[in-house]
Amino acid sequence: QQGLYLPIVYNTSSYEKVETLRLLEGYVDIYLPDLKYVDSAISSRYSHAADYFTCASAAIAEMVRQVGEPEFVFERAAGKEGSSAEFPADEKKKISEQQNNMIFDAAEYQERSEAGEFLLMRKGVIVRHLVMPDCVEDSKRVISYLLKTYGGQIFISIMNQYTPLPQCREYPELSRRVTEAEYDAVVDYAIELGIENGFIQEGDVAEESFIPEFD
């Protein structure tokens, strides 16, 4: 109401009560939930939460209900200066007003991105999944569930940045990074299922710089 154009983003593990998320309705524009596991044995071992998938899947459903399918706008419509800066003030205002009224869906986002245009998400859900060592089959179950449940209603980010830390020494299978073969197997599976709205990570991105300072 007072001119704030930046979308409000909510970053979450998805291990949340639906009742809590309903309190956020109307305040959050973009949800960034994780969907870590489907297998209760894996979620119990690594997160002490046998009910993780039950809770997380219900939470994600509520997020999608709230914000709906993804929408994108030009970067300038989100409050940044862009290439219109070189135009006269009156022309720049006209361009800005036109772009503020242009909203793109996921398919149009893909097309314009490939053409070199830079769009920002205005609303939507991006579900993140971190591939972990020795968990390829469960990762496939995660991807399958998301695609069969939501299709093009969401974006899926398949992440390759798992970083082993000293605290994981009690789990020897987690003492290494995800191999290229493991990550590629998950990405290839998503492609086989027909994923359209997705993000992948290329190269070696497993670094401690991805881990926040929680202390």
Model-derived features: positions:
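Core AdoMet radical
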Residues: 1-21, 25-73, 200
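Auxiliary Fe-S-binding modules of radical SAM enzymes
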Residues: 71-215
